[in-house]
Amino acid sequence: MKLLYDKKIIIEKYDDENYIIYSPFNHKFTKASKSVKKLVLYILNENGEIEFENIINYYKQFDIELKIDEIKKYIDTLVKAKLFFYNQEDYDTEKRITLEDYRFSPTQEIDMVYIHPTLRCNFNCSYCYNKSLAATQKELTTNQWIQIINKLKAMNVNYFIFTGGEPLMRKDLIDIIREIKDDNTKVEILSNGSLLMDKVDQLLPIVDSFVVSLDSLDIKKNSINRSAVGFNNIINLLEYFSEKAPKKLRVRSVITKENIDTIQAFNNEIQEKYGIKCVNVRFIPNNKDELSLIAEPPIPDIDDTKKYKLDLGIRKYRCGACSNILAINPEGDIYPCQSLMLPEFKLANILDDNWQDTVANSEVTKKFRNIKVDDMENCKDCAYRYICGGGCPAIAYKVYGDLNHHLSFFCDYLEKESRQRMRMAKIISK
């Protein structure tokens, strides 16, 4: 008997007793004991050839006595997990299904929209991905935003993220959210936090989650990349949420070379002092000149992830732009995502009567829906391709002018992150 399998199959240590076995070509994985891991190594070494007497003798060198029925049971378990296959037909079918599953589905519906009610901001963050956009744009009225969002809700969009600019620069933000919020609609606010304290009592009942940007509890360190404006308000905000609703707030830090050495200590301090989760995000360069600012964010270790229940699962990743995500600027122009609100990526205007057809048939939409990691040079043969997805197309475009360009400067980090997600997958499901 000969088993078929992906030659790049990965064995990743999970803990002292177990391992994660991952099959890259079909993105299937399972947790395995030491005994099963030994069998996998044997199968790989023998190129899939199964001779039961040889396997029995192989195990004896580890002082393990196994019967043929036990070995068959192990193999059946690996086959049921779709890590190994008894015949070529099953292997080919699995490969075809995987490739079809990764492609964009025409029935995919938009379910998340980034709302930019304004691009005005009272900060001037050095790494802002929207800093090149003019804050002098016209802005839709209160009633226009309410009507637009209610139309999107009727299309089954159920997640609205208010961002900017600083969304709280709009004095009517509370009015807009109050009008569109219901039990089936999730609302999130991305804010620098400086203006939030004065309005948090009104927003807390109608907003599901808040993300506030902060790099340090030290005003001088925080001001290196951000601003000192409203710093005390942000600290008061942490204390408020710590007491009232710690699970509704996340603190987001952008990792750069200026803060890479202190960010983990900052994360720990926020979590221990306020009971609030921290989210570290990579710096997104706006051009090649900013590549020098990139630092590799720390990968949360397993103990930290267990303690704070961070979700680092092993989902198959692909960019959601134009498939389940859209972004709308202050004038109502629609874009694939919040990081690519550039003239060349404008899809339509939300006020147009036929905007849905325009978006669906746009050449920009087709470009994003045709992005496949299996077609990317340097990625298509990588064992981690379905876990990392090849990286962010917005970064690739801003740095290289090509949505499909390989992000060599992020590759090592993305591999480490992928391996960690593999190790964490079963912890999360416990």
Enumerate the predicted regions with their spans.
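N-terminal [4Fe-4S]-dependent radical SAM core
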Residues: 8-14, 19-31, 71-114
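Canonical Radical SAM [4Fe-4S] cluster-binding loop centered on the CxxxCxxC motif
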Residues: 106-142
